[in-house]
Amino acid sequence: MYKATIVIPNINGKGWLKDSIESVYAQTEQNFRLIVVDNGSTDESLEQARSYCSRENFTLIENGTNTGFSHAVNQGIALADSEYVVLFNNDAFAEPQWLAELLRTADADPKIFAVQSLMIRHFERELADDAGDYV
């Protein structure tokens, strides 16, 4: 069993998906499964995703049509066989310590049920895009 399952929903992410996946595989924490759920991409991103299918910890779900973000995410979650599930957008890029820090935070207290990263804007790196929500 993996420590984390990372789910990336994708539709027409040709310009970002490969770099997004590569940033996940560059993590210092390697105890994860990566699931990409493709929602009927018509660009080259589906082929980009298929190029990772030989990796043991990679799963690709091909929907053929756009079933929507929530459905795609739920498909990935349904296949999760790990302690944690991590949602990751197809246009996001992670620093090498990202997953290790998320898991360390989640493990710090049994009362923690959700964690979120500080997201920095890609082209305006001095600006935060999202800093989480209070639940």
Regions found by a protein language model. Name each.
Residues K3-T5, R33:
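Cell-envelope/extracellular polymer assembly enzymes that use nucleotide-activated donors
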Residues S23-N31:
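Short, acidic, metal-binding catalytic loop of nucleotide-sugar glycosyltransferases
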Residues E62-A80, N90:
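Glycine-rich, basic loop-to-helix element that forms the pyrophosphate-binding segment
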Residues I8-D19, E29, G40:
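Active-site beta-to-alpha loop of glycosyltransferases that engages the nucleotide-sugar donor
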Residues V85:
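Short aromatic/hydrophobic "clamp" motif used to bind/position activated sugar donors
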Residues F32-G40, T59-N63:
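Short beta-strand/loop segment that forms part of the nucleotide-sugar
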Residues P96-D133:
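Conserved donor NDP-sugar-binding/catalytic core segment of glycosyltransferases
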Residues S23, D38-E47, T65:
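A conserved acidic beta->alpha catalytic loop
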